[in-house]
A protein has these predicted regions:
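Membrane-interface transmembrane helices that cradle and orient dolichyl/undecaprenyl
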Residues: 160-174
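Membrane-interface alpha helices of multi-pass inner-membrane proteins
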Residues: 174-197
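Membrane-interface helix caps and helix-loop-helix hairpins in membrane proteins
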Residues: 94-97, 142-152, 305-311
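Transmembrane-helix motifs of polytopic, lipid-linked glycan transferases
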Residues: 102-123
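Short hydrophobic/aromatic helix or loop-helix immediately within or flanking a transmembrane segment
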Residues: 57-65, 72-94
Length: 313
């Protein structure tokens, strides 16, 4: 299949994103960088069509509440980034769906940018078929529903992974910016962000990585109730909600998961196995080692506390 002229491709995409989708995937197979951006745009357009359910419905109602208020600055409340954007969009009479589009687009763009960077740095991924299969694994492991309908946690998770990669692998200071924005988008990401900073400044090996993961699990299961009582207010209520409340272990949300959903959840947790393998095979001096340890710690926490929306996969 011959490549279309780039300008013709752009015209075709904006005339019919759906008809151009096969071309987008073909150009991704050819490892064209621009194709990843167009796929992120396509998924952003799909998000515009999604019915407002779950958290998205509440955020939509909040948009209309803010429309009747005179807000000119930052909305100082938990998850400040989203609520400030909602307030500004309501004030300027910009459609709420644009926020949904932006969160989905930038989330996927960050994941795809991370994948493309790894692809460029590893000669073993020059094989188009292997690289494309790995990309499909990434694409289908990112939970579109979490980003589109939850907005905050899905986007915050993308910020955390992207920031951790920039900081731990590429040693770029702008990684701190993304890690700073993550808990401002969703408070639950403050622990993974702290984990990324620990991995950055503490020399880790496999055993120490396992130890930190176990300690993180014990702390999350044992002391979070005390933290929620001590902190009180909205932050305390949120911690309780995600640890022992609706979204916590044995919470109401877990009871609503069907048999097929449980099977999918447990299969998802098998993602820890390749991380363990890579931690054994890759030496600690490798720039990827710290990032792999960071990912493993997050997967370990996710596996046991069952906060199923913590990671995109």
């Amino acid at each position: 299949m011959r490549e279309l002229n780039f300008r013709i491709f752009i015209i075709l995409f904006f005339m019919s994103p759906l008809l151009s989708f096969p071309l987008i995937m073909y150009y991704i197979y050819l490892q064209r960088k621009y194709a990843y951006t167009f796929l992120a745009l396509f998924l952003g357009f799909v998000a515009l069509l999604y019915a407002p359910t779950h958290d998205l419905f509440r955020h939509n109602l909040l948009y209309y509440d803010f429309a009747g208020e005179s807000i000119s600055g930052i909305v100082f409340r938990q998850d400040v980034l989203l609520y400030t954007l909602i307030a500004w969009f309501a004030k300027w009479n910009i459609n709420f769906e644009i926020i949904r589009f932006l969160f989905v687009f930038f989330s996927y763009q960050m994941y795809f940018s991370l994948f493309y960077s790894i692809q460029r740095k590893n000669t073993s991924l020059n094989n188009k078929r292997i690289s494309f299969l790995l990309f499909l694994l990434l694409l289908f492991s990112i939970r579109f529903f979490v980003i589109c309908c939850g907005l905050r946690q899905g986007f915050a998770t993308a910020l955390t992974f992207f920031g951790a990669y920039k900081l731990l692998v590429e040693n770029q200071k702008k990684g701190y910016v993304f890690l700073f924005l993550a808990p401002l988008t969703h408070l639950s990401l403050i622990i993974p962000v702290a984990g990324a900073l620990i991995v950055k400044y503490v020399r880790l090996n496999f055993k120490l990585g396992i130890f930190i993961a176990i300690v993180s699990y014990v702390i999350s299961m044992t002391f979070m109730d005390y933290f929620s009582s001590f902190l009180g207010g909205d932050i305390g209520k949120t911690i309780e909600l995600y640890t022992s409340g609706y979204w916590g272990t044995s919470g109401e949300a877990e009871g609503q998961i069907s048999l097929k959903g449980r099977i999918a959840l447990y299969i998802n947790q098998l993602q820890m196995l390749p991380f363990i393998y890579l931690m054994y095979k890759i030496k600690g001096k490798n720039s990827y080692f710290s990032f792999i340890v960071f990912c493993f710690i997050l997967c370990f926490i996710k596996c046991f506390i069952k906060v199923i929306t913590l990671l995109p996969c």
